[in-house]
């Protein structure tokens, strides 16, 4: 079977949540990959299947995927943890039956650990033409597991990159901090709320103010409501969900983005990309792939994973505001690595190479 044919038509299988105003990382990346492929291949040459709620209609989903495979020179899937166990075998079957290439664009940085004790799933994924991961760390871990089809493609975002003259400078205390992500326990929300309040208490003044943006997950809402009820709104405030595509304008003017994640499966977090594109540095926990994204002292300040006392120490550093204000230009420069334009160049190369991981 010919495997190096030119790629003209592409099918994308993922959680698009069509018709819904959703801004979580999975949906945003899935939609962005579709748009990148449309711009590279032409709108008429890219079709998709939305997997939202597929468990209720598995037969209908299978039929749609078969029709998509008949149309496509390459199928690109973007499932999360549970979905990969279903869609990886499906794409292997469709690849064999219809001759289309199979590509897995991974969301986040969890895949290597997830499949370490799943040899059957790993075998399926090794037969893919390409697996696109967000970091060199994940690529290295997969290479150690015997994969030879892994490429690095960042989590690109379609955002306006601010120019230097557009950057708004915070004027002083209380220094404004922002959280900009889905709101649930593993994002470290409790840690940053505690750290801001504790820092202000120890300093004896309102040195920091925290604004929280994002969709509160249902399982965390009751806890979050209690957490917010115990805060003074002038110190910690929930600002709701920011309009899609307006993250840079919302973040412009903040001193720093707080990213206190407790999730080891982070890859290239979209919220950090948002911050860089707005010229905003980050205070981040050291998730496993952090060093590929956060340059210590250049684009952010990091602290020990899971250690909220270390987060507090960061805030109590009297030089922190001065250090962060000096990072704005490097952050803008770093943001270009994750821009839509950078993504176009990468996906154009991937398509022209036939998603051949061995010719990169």
Q: What kind of feature is each model-predicted range?
A:
Residues 252-266, 280:
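Acidic donor-binding loop of glycosyltransferase active sites
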Residues 127-164:
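Donor nucleotide-sugar binding/catalytic pocket of nucleotide-sugar-dependent glycosyltransferases
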């Amino acid at each position: 079977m010919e495997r190096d044919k030119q790629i003209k038509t592409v099918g994308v299988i993922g959680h698009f949540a069509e018709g819904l105003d959703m801004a979580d990382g999975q949906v945003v990346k899935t939609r962005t990959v579709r748009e990148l492929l449309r711009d590279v291949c032409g709108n008429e040459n890219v079709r998709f299947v939305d997997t939202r709620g597929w468990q209720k209609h598995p037969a209908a989903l299978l039929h749609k995927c078969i029709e998509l495979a008949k149309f496509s020179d390459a199928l690109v899937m973007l499932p999360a943890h549970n979905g990969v166990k279903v869609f990886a075998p499906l794409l292997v079957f469709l690849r064999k039956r219809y001759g289309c290439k199979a590509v897995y664009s991974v969301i986040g940085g969890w895949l290597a650990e997830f499949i370490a004790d799943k040899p059957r799933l790993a075998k399926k994924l090794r037969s893919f033409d390409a697996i696109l991961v967000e970091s060199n760390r994940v690529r290295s871990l997969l290479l150690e597991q015997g994969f030879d089809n892994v490429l690095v493609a960042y989590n690109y975002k379609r955002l306006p990159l601010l120019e230097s003259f557009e950057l708004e400078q915070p004027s002083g205390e209380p220094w404004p901090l922002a959280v900009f992500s889905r709101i649930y326990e593993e994002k470290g929300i409790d840690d940053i709320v505690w750290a801001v309040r504790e820092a202000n208490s120890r300093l004896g003044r309102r040195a920091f103010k925290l604004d929280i943006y994002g969709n509160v997950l249902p399982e965390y809402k009751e806890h979050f409501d209690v957490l917010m009820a115990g805060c003074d709104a002038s110190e910690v405030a929930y600002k709701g969900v920011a309009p899609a595509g307006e993250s840079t304008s919302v973040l412009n003017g903040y001193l720093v983005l707080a990213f206190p994640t407790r999730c080891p499966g982070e890859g290239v977090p979209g919220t950090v990309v948002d911050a860089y594109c707005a010229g905003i540095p980050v205070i981040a926990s050291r998730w496993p792939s952090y060093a590929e994204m956060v340059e210590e002292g250049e684009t952010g300040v990091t602290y020990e994973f899971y250690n909220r006392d270390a987060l507090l120490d960061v805030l109590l550093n009297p030089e922190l505001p001065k250090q962060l204000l000096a990072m704005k230009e490097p952050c803008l420069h770093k943001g270009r690595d994750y821009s839509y334009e950078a993504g176009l160049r990468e996906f154009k190369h991937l398509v022209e190479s036939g998603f051949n991981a061995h010719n990169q």
